[in-house]
Curated annotation (Swiss-Prot):
The gene is HEMA2. One of its GO terms (molecular function) is NADP binding. One of its GO terms (biological process) is protoporphyrinogen IX biosynthetic process. During catalysis, the active site Cys acts as a nucleophile attacking the alpha-carbonyl group of tRNA-bound glutamate with the formation of a thioester intermediate between enzyme and glutamate, and the concomitant release of tRNA(Glu). The thioester intermediate is finally reduced by direct hydride transfer from NADPH, to form the product GSA. Gene3D superfamilies: Glutamyl-tRNA reductase, N-terminal domain (3.30.460.30), NAD(P)-binding Rossmann-like Domain (3.40.50.720). Catalyzes the NADPH-dependent reduction of glutamyl-tRNA(Glu) to glutamate 1-semialdehyde (GSA). Pfam families: GlutR_dimer, GlutR_N, Shikimate_DH. This is Glutamyl-tRNA reductase 2. Its main location: plastid. Substrate binds at residues 62-65, 122, 127-129, 133. Pathway: Porphyrin-containing compound metabolism; protoporphyrin-IX biosynthesis; 5-aminolevulinate from L-glutamyl-tRNA(Glu): step 1/2. It is an enzyme of class 1 (oxidoreductase). It is found in: Plastid, Chloroplast.
Length: 465
């Protein structure tokens, strides 16, 4: 039955695919249902690779995107299994999910990841945080042993592309982050004359929260209240940023702190809402000098502030999707910078595809070496028997063994050179594959079916156990 299954896939090379949604394709209320906390990435990878047609997997989940990268033994079946997994996880029907998902294959999927890493697909062009998040996928995968060789190499090459794009072009010059865009949005909504006197509250002292404080300083703010579960992170921010007064308040005093704030920034990992309509209605009114409206700027995914707060007369809520208003400025300059970075991405893409193409011949190389070594060992044994063990000392025996190994290596050198397709010479992939198929026929290696049979057999046995 495994040979029948292998025959079905023999003409279809395994595909690299990305299935996901981002700030460009789906609203935040859908993205938050699919968000996977970083500590749960290994579990998600384990669940994905247990699917029948998924061989490798990685998860990239941020406030602006949720993307799953896989190596699928079958494109159609693999995609269907991943979409069903996403539907089951989020509770969103697969038919509804498909309206917002994007799906890219092979070079399209790889180029997309490289563009993501370079900050070209970000809401904020060239922002640096996404590169750190791509790096974290690799670190997480290495610690948990969850990444396969294709996905691991693709993400590492994406990091290289992201670094080169920032170093060799001016794409990150003047680039803002989600945190700085949030501060900019708040300043746009406040009365201009009152920006510096507005009472600022930050809930959450993580990486993005720290950046909020940094950009408030850049805007000239002199004081910010920070609510956090523990005081240690707030102390660390206070130690680093001397140009602003930072007042710590524990999580138990969050609503009291909000009552004394004109602008509330939220940036926590909480999976439940911190502020609902009822909370906003219970807060005291804001002075008319401040516009009479309390601003909630929520850069968390899942969201910390309910959208229903905007139904409250004296409250307005903005989430990550609303930051587009800030970053749409200088659109022409953004396009020009992106074009400069695309040339670098194309170079890195060619290198990765050459490496992946070269993997097709690896099973043939292993089979040919094994075949040659079996013949060498058999003939060596016959030779040693004819000579007789009594007539051989250790040095002579070792010399004969080295001679046989050397002859085999010399004979294999030419054929193996013609199985290389790593971009180091002018040989095309088609030429290399023709050589591979010729060797398969000449030596009856039958490599492709053997490899596919092993993969399918392992998958079937895993699901049946």
């Amino acid at each position: 039955q495994f040979k029948i299954s292998a025959d079905r896939y023999i003409k279809e090379k395994s595909s690299i695919a990305v299935i996901g949604l981002s700030v460009h394709t789906a609203p935040v209320d859908m993205r938050e249902k699919l968000a996977v906390a970083e500590e749960l990435w290994p579990r998600a990878i384990s669940e994905l690779t247990s699917l029948n047609h998924i061989e490798e997997a990685a998860v990239l989940s941020t406030c602006n995107r949720m993307e799953i990268y896989v190596v699928a033994l079958s494109w159609n079946r693999g995609i269907r299994e991943v979409v069903d997994w996403m539907s089951k996880k989020s509770g969103i029907p697969a038919s509804e999910l498909r309206e917002h998902l994007f799906m890219l294959r092979d070079s399209g999927a790889t180029r997309h990841l490289f563009e993501v890493s370079a900050g070209l697909d970000s809401l904020v062009l060239g922002e640096g945080q996404i590169l750190a998040q791509v790096k974290q996928v690799v670190r997480n995968g290495q610690n948990s042993g969850g990444l396969g060789k294709n996905i691991d190499r693709m993400f590492k090459d994406a990091i290289t592309a992201g670094k080169r794009a920032r170093c060799e072009t001016n794409i990150s010059a003047g680039a803002v982050s989600v945190s700085s865009a949030a501060v900019e949005l708040a300043m746009m909504k406040l009365p201009k004359s009152e920006c510096l006197s507005a009472r600022m509250l930050l809930i959450g002292a993580g990486k993005m929260g720290k950046l909020v404080v940094k950009h408030l300083i850049a805007k000239g703010c002199k004081k910010v209240v920070v609510v956090n579960r523990s005081v240690e992170r707030v102390d660390a921010i206070r130690e680093e940023m001397k140009d602003i007064e930072i007042v710590y308040r524990p999580l138990t005093e969050m609503y009291e702190a909000a009552a004394d704030a004109d602008v509330v920034f939220t940036s926590t990992a909480s999976e439940s809402l911190l502020f609902t309509k009822e909370h906003a209605e219970a807060l005291p009114p804001i002075s008319l000098a401040m516009g009479g409206v309390r601003l909630f700027v929520d850069i968390s995914v899942p969201r910390n502030v309910g959208a229903c707060l905007s139904q409250v007369e004296h409250a307005r809520v903005y989430n990550v999707d609303d930051l587009k208003e800030v970053v749409e400025a200088n659109k022409e300059d953004r396009v020009r910078k992106a074009m400069e970075a695309q040339a670098i991405i194309t170079q890195e893409l060619k290198r990765f595809e050459a490496w992946r193409d070269s993997l097709e011949t690896v099973p043939t190389i292993k089979k040919l070496r094994s075949y040659a070594d079996r013949i060498r060992a058999s003939e060596l044994d016959k030779c040693l028997q004819k000579i007789g063990e009594d007539n051989l000392n250790k040095k002579t025996r070792r010399s004969i063994e080295e001679l046989s190994t050397g002859i085999v290596n010399k004979l294999l050198h030419g054929p193996l050179q013609h199985l290389r397709c790593d971009g180091s010479d002018s040989r095309t992939l088609d030429e290399t594959l023709d050589n591979m198929h010729a060797l398969n026929r000449m030596f009856n290696l039958d490599t492709e079916k053997a490899v596919l049979e092993q993969k399918i057999k392992a998958k079937v046995e895993k699901t049946q156990s």
